[in-house]
Amino acid sequence: MTEKIKNFQDLRIWQKGIEVVKEIYILTKKFPKEELYGLTSQMRRSAVSIPSNIAEGFRRYHNKEYKQFLYIAMGSCAELETQIIISYELGLSLIHI
């Protein structure tokens, strides 16, 4: 019998999202100071948005609302992917997607 997940923190996708946040913070810590309010800030916001939207959607009453927040999280993933590509192209990161 499978247990019903009662807390968003038990979701593997939320846990992976938290790992992404930590990795992005480590990566952007190495960026030049002049990027603090540019790419650094944008990448951190995009990363934080991923598990945040998963958690918020989990707390919604209807599945339709939950799905909407999952779509928003997916959009944040696409934003972050683009920003990682930009950081690579600018020579700020060795990560290539």
Where are these regions (language model features)?
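Amphipathic alpha-helical assembly/interaction segments
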Residues: 1-94
